[in-house]
Amino acid sequence: MRPESRAKDLPSASLPASLSVLALRFKIFYAKHIKAENMLSEQIIKELQKILGKDNVLTSKAERICYSYDATQQSFLPEVVLQPGSTEEIALVMKLANRERIPVFPRGAGSGFTGGSLPTKGGIVLCTEQMDQILEIDEENLVATVEPGVVTERFQKAVEKVGLFYPPDPASLKFSTLGGNVAECAGGPRCVKYGVTKDFIIGLEVVTPTGDIITTGGPTMKGVVGYDLTKLLCGSEGTLGIITRIVIKLLPLPEAKKTMLVLFDSIDGAAQAVSAITRNKIVPTTLEFMDGRTIECVRQATDLDLPETAQAVLIIEVDGDREFLDKQANRIAEIIKPLGVVETRIATTPEESEALWQIRRSVSASLRKVNPDKFNEDICVPRSKVPEMIRKVDAISDKYQIPIVNFGHAGDGNIHVNIMVNRKVSGDIMKAEGAIKDVFKAALELGGTMSGEHGVGIAKAPYIPLEITPVAAEYMKAIKKALDPNNILNPGKIFLDSPEN
């Protein structure tokens, strides 16, 4: 983000007092007004059935409940769920919805952490899960074309079978869809070397909110004719168009990879190690970290071997030609040895590599031993600022007297801040909301951002004024207005709607 688009000050007065109050207001308002204002008539349902076929228009309450929630654990009941099978069907649906002013909420797998796919105004959930074809893998040009409902891991395995590689690897890859990945510009551990989703998307087919079908970009590695709508749509959270086809750049599959787990006596040592590695012209595939509190959670919840003296962990993975990997791993171990290393473990087999990664994969389940509920934020700061950010988070934890544990992608400064609460304990939610705002402010003070991967949705929307200036926000809203004049596509996401709108 350019400097001029950042807010110079951090006004707290412009924000709602609490996210739970905000969520409650959402539910009260929509519970009162959806039926009166947005209930779909029998005629509208018949028109939708004519477009999609009766089996692809879900109206029973049981079916609609299945599409009412995402990973935030919030739930809003849509009036109908649509399962289109083609771009043309989606275009007809959007023309109808735009004509009748019916809100439409695009949905992939519903794996998001910010409420981006929640049908907060009832209306239509348009789910692209049936559009799940890998249309082409072009081995000669290193390009693939897919529909939006293709599951990320399935696609990765398909291209790897022919010796190709799609690097973005969000934690949800076993069930998230590529359409959702594009809408949120998903990241993952391998982003430190290869980049995020938008770095691999070179073309899109999209249905606009008014029902037009447009294509952006294409299967070429270069293209500068007109505005770059592909990049605009990538990360737009389903507010500007519905993705119906994706053109993806691929890479040759690396021959091999090698995994290391390094334990440090301080978070500062781990951060210095990250800088030292990159300064020595080594770019690992992954540089994952866990702080001392996270290590303690894993130690208490599992029988995994983690020394008491370890206050930070780096999981480092390198890939490339097999003959160079041992040399590269040994060079990394040599570089970081003076930085407070407690122990270094280098995998020599795939099984040993999996055992090292098991320590990282056990984190989420281990956190539930601390408290049953969590707010999972994903701030990002310059990587040299990671230790300072961790110290600020520790101070925020002490201030509000609630546990906060941190892990994430050290290579790009993306910290997953997990604020652990018990919703049944009076006052815990209010404490968490105060902590969340303080965490966001601390990240911004260090030159960071409130979200590196998860997006804004409704969860972070109240905090937009902390990061985006009013002038920059108005330009963003102008883009939305131009593409969606009636504000029917995923309304209320990124920028909150007022009840009057």
Where in this protein do the model-derived segments appear?
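FAD-binding subdomain of flavoenzyme oxidoreductases
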Residues: 133-290
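Short hydrophobic alpha-helical segments enriched in small aliphatic residues
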Residues: 21, 31-34
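Alpha-helix capping/hinge segments and adjacent helical runs
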Residues: 54, 444-456, 485-489
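C-terminal substrate-recognition/cap domain of FAD-linked oxidoreductases
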Residues: 59-61, 65-67, 251-252, 258-435, ...
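Activity-critical C-terminal alpha-helical subdomain
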Residues: 212, 461-501
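N-terminal flexible segment immediately upstream of the FAD-binding catalytic core
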Residues: 35-95, 111-142, 171, 294-303, ...
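Short Gly/Ser/Thr- and charged-rich N-terminal loops/segments
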Residues: 1, 6, 12-27
